[in-house]
Amino acid sequence: MSKKKEVIKFSLQLLAIVAVTTVTFTKIIIPVRVDGQSMYPTLHDEDIAIVNALSLERSDIKRFDIVVLKCEKLDKDIVKRVIGLPGDTLVYRDDKLYINGTYYDEKYLNKDYIAKAKIKYQTELFTNDFEITLNDDEIFVLGDNRL
């Protein structure tokens, strides 16, 4: 094979690699930077989360999944934890989560961090009390750091 053909072949292979890599990391595997402390201590400010854009079906979302949402109000992506699914009634009372009347232990929350944070910020509640019923097209998300 002539030198010119080798250069052309190499250039085409390199171009194909660049094209596949670009498509993969802009349309299929999307890196998202965590901005702020709202998911601490599970995720830290500036951590990178990888999103598989091919599996972004809303019906695949499960309770307590960590999700990336496009926040139009802030004009950026946000990382949060799914607490409520369509139709759920959520109640937080005295730092306890009830979903449709059933108590759920939020095992993903760091109990030591919560105890220290309550002392540091001189508060009795880590999650403010509330009650909400979701519509059939809504999910409810919270960060893991609720102070």
Could you say what each language-model-derived stretch is?
Residues 9-27:
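Hydrophobic membrane-insertion alpha-helices, especially the h-region
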